[in-house]
Curated annotation (Swiss-Prot):
This is Photosystem I P700 chlorophyll a apoprotein A2. [4Fe-4S] cluster binds at C559, C568. Keywords: 4Fe-4S, Chlorophyll, Chloroplast, Chromophore, Electron transport, Iron, Iron-sulfur, Magnesium, Membrane, Metal-binding, Oxidoreductase, Photosynthesis, Photosystem I, Plastid, Thylakoid, Transmembrane, Transmembrane helix, Transport. The chain crosses the membrane at residues 46-69, 135-158, 175-199, 273-291, 330-353, 369-395, 417-439, 517-535, 575-596, 643-665, 707-727. The lineage of its organism: Eukaryota, Viridiplantae, Streptophyta, Embryophyta, Tracheophyta.
Length: 734
């Protein structure tokens, strides 16, 4: 018999229905559930797949470099970053008529092209790339690295090169390797690149492989380093009149603590960033020498955790038993990693616009909007995944005996208190915030806008003032001219900080008012509700009052039959499924807020946001409707323009999003009827009927249909907003 998909499951591969295909796809990456799997094989497969993942990332980055070098305008852009539009790649499309060809021929290109809104041009420019040859070199190098990683992936699946299970569970060695080797040494290498290549390039020099070892990045070379006079490296920084990419106004410092932004590029000082990476390198290289491996010195993670016991009171056994629980559970480790990565990704979104590291990024409004939105959505999905794997940990890997009375067990024991507090916070935020918005709407509708309830965010304004923002008149800490901190700051540390905080040219500390107060609490509602659903799903994964035996049913199940009430829609998977809708909803509010506040600032029209954001009609009319006008009229009987593709994507995104409801509301999405109709027509068509459909179409399971519905809802939602964001921003600012 010919082996059929999925090879990893004997039972599924013999299923005569379309369930075989659906369940095969659903469990393809659930290595734990595959036939003949062992713990060792599981670890080896995951290890090899990491190399494959890295190879894909390097291939993708290589493709970016290659296509810009081949079809972009990097060298032209470098001459005038503020006025030349960066080209991502050419468009070859047989459907383009003459109007489309003309509309998409821009940025000095000979034919239709896509404009880059990813910020890669600014990134490459900042780190010292200047011409197409540099881009090609980078592309070829990354291609070689990708090939190397693919080879490593294959190699580590060969019998002689398979790592043992004990190697994978050697937590201290892995910590040392990741801290010192990956974070520490790579930060040191990046410091080296910034000092030897990027900073000289920014000052009009040109350093490449042929003169890298002969060009000293500082006039005094390594002398100050060996003599202990490190402060020499911070003397004579670039002046405020420095022209980026030239020696006009350039200094000689390589490690500084200036603070604020380069006045021309509106990005962080390169010498500050080199200093930052050097500090990170030192800290992490030291951190990577702290854990005990072959040499019998340093800390043992197990001893550290076992020592974490409350000194008295009825506080249980602290972190006892956690070492083995974490070290033997891939889901626990993945949950921790995803939670950390999710937070970091969201922080990247926040910092890329408030403290831009790349030259001229702050003046490329569409790119800023795209990068913020992109990183916030990615963060949302990653964070939801953290809770999903946390729930799977409780179902598959949690051992109550091993964790008796430690922090994990105690968290499960008082889960009702955790869940009810989250519920209370969500209800409070929801009713009060909506109440304020609706009250304000009614006042405007009845012609008495002065009766709105407008609350100044005084605590947040006070915090901004403490950090040096003077416009609120609080006169506290750094915003007080008499405080020792603000006096020291002007000379000793970060002298550029106070200027940056009080400048209107950046997004560092935006002025906030009643509209910000309201939307802040709307976002807080979304965050708390999403967290409530996810936390409840994980904490109730093993069992709840309604269903104490839930852990026998696994991660996802629709119901326990018709005879047992209260068992529907309460699996841990269902919590994840519901939470993703709330996550998307919350990030919708976050990105709406960010985008509307910024376009009004960029247009010099901050009053529009301040006046219209205090009631819901303001958001619907003055943000969504007003900014979608170009999309709604993107192509019409009189022709099209360079926004037409976004107008089409806006429409298409709505279509995909709406398709989700076919699966979400009627549950099964008519899969059985659809496929049977297609198969019937296929088998009655000459030539086509030579190939016959063998799998009997059966209705999607409830869980499958929810997944398909959720996937369409998410993809459509993001497509729609991406088109709206890019078109409305690029339509205004070019």
């Amino acid at each position: 018999m010919v082996s059929r998909f999925p090879k990893f499951s004997q039972g599924l591969s013999q299923d005569p229905t379309t369930r075989r295909i659906w369940f095969g796809i659903a469990t393809a990456h659930d290595f734990e559930s595959h036939d003949d799997t062992t713990e060792e094989r599981l670890y080896q497969k995951i290890f090899a797949s990491h190399f494959g993942q890295l190879a894909i990332i390097f291939l993708w980055t290589s493709g970016n470099l290659f296509h810009v070098a081949w079809q972009g305008n990097f060298e032209t852009w470098v001459q005038d970053p503020l006025h030349v539009r960066p080209i991502a790649h050419a468009i070859w499309d047989p459907h383009f008529g003459q109007p489309a060809v003309e509309a998409y021929t821009r940025g000095g290109s000979a034919g239709p092209v896509n404009i880059a809104y990813s910020g890669v041009y600014q990134w490459w420019y900042t780190i010292g790339l200047r011409n197409n040859e540099d881009l090609y070199t980078g592309a070829i190098f990354l291609l070689a690295v990708a090939a190397l990683f693919l080879l490593a992936s294959w190699l580590h699946l060969q019998p002689k090169w398979k790592p043992s299970i004990s190697w994978f569970k050697n937590a201290e060695s892995r910590l040392n390797h990741h801290l010192s080797g990956l974070f520490g040494v790579s930060s040191l290498a990046w410091t080296g690149h910034l000092i030897h290549v990027a900073i000289p390039e920014a000052r009009g020099g040109h350093v490449r492989w042929n003169d890298l070892l002969t060009t000293a990045p500082h006039p005094q070379g390594l002398g100050p380093f060996f003599s202990g006079q490190w402060s020499v490296y911070s003397q004579n920084p670039d002046s405020n009149t420095h022209l980026f990419n030239s020696n006009q106004g350039a200094g000689t410092a390589i490690l500084t603590f200036l603070g604020g932004f380069h006045p021309q590029t509106q990005s962080l000082w390169l010498t500050d960033m080199a200093h930052h990476h050097l500090a990170i390198a030192v800290v992490f290289i030291i951190a990577g020498h702290m854990y005990r491996t072959n040499f019998g010195i340093g800390h043992s993670m197990k001893e550290i955790l076992d020592a974490h016991i409350p000194p008295g009171g009825k506080l249980g056994r602290g972190h006892r038993g956690l070492y083995d629980t974490v070290n033997n559970s891939l889901h626990f480790q993945l949950g921790l990693a995803l939670a950390a990565l999710g937070v970091i990704t969201s922080l990247v979104a926040q910092h890329m616009y408030s403290l831009p590291a790349y030259a001229f990024l702050a003046q490329d409004y569409t790119t800023q909007a795209a990068l913020y939105t992109h990183h916030q959505y990615i963060a949302g999905f990653i964070m939801a995944g953290a809770f999903a794997h946390g729930a799977i940990f409780f179902l598959r890997d949690y051992d109550p005996e091993q964790n008796r009375d430690n922090v994990l067990a105690r968290m499960l024991e008082h889960k009702e208190a955790i869940i009810s507090h989250l519920s209370w916070a969500s209800l409070f935020l929801g009713f009060h915030t909506l109440g304020l918005y609706v009250h304000n709407d009614v006042m405007l509708a009845f012609g008495t806008p002065e009766k709105q309830i407008l609350i100044e965010p005084v605590f947040a304004q006070w915090i901004q003032s403490a950090h040096g923002k003077v416009s609120y008149g609080f006169d506290v800490l750094l915003s007080s001219v008499d405080s020792p901190a603000s006096n020291a700051g002007r000379g000793l540390w970060l002298p550029g900080w106070l200027d940056a905080v009080n400048s209107s040219n950046n997004s560092l500390f935006l002025t906030i008012g009643p509209g910000d107060f309201l939307v802040h609490h709307a976002i807080a509602l979304g965050l708390h509700t999403t967290t409530l659903i996810l936390v409840k799903g994980a904490l109730d994964a093993r069992g709840s009052k309604l269903m104490p035996d839930k852990k026998e049913f696994g991660y996802s199940f629709p119901c326990d039959g018709p005879g047992r009430g209260g068992t529907c829609d309460i699996s841990a998977w269902d919590a994840f499924y519901l939470a993703v809708f709330w996550m998307l909803n919350t990030i919708g509010w976050v990105t709406f807020y960010w985008h509307w506040k910024h376009i009004t600032l960029w247009q010099g029209n901050a009053a529009q946001f301040n006046e219209s954001s205090t009631y819901l009609m303001g958001w619907l009319r003055d943000y969504l409707w007003l900014n979608s006008s170009q999309l709604i009229n993107g192509y019409n009987p009189f022709g099209m323009n360079s926004l037409s593709v976004w107008a089409w994507m806006f429409l298409f995104g709505h279509l995909v999003w709406a398709t989700g409801f076919m699966f979400l509301i009627s549950w099964r999405g008519y899969w059985q009827e659809l496929i049977e109709t297609l198969a019937w027509a296929h088998e009655r068509t000459p030539l086509a009927n030579m190939i016959r459909w063998k799998d009997k179409p059966v209705a999607l399971s409830i869980v499958q249909a929810r997944l398909v519905g959720l996937a369409h809802f998410s993809v459509g939602y993001i497509f729609t907003y991406a088109a709206f964001l890019i078109a409305s921003t690029s339509g205004k600012f070019g």
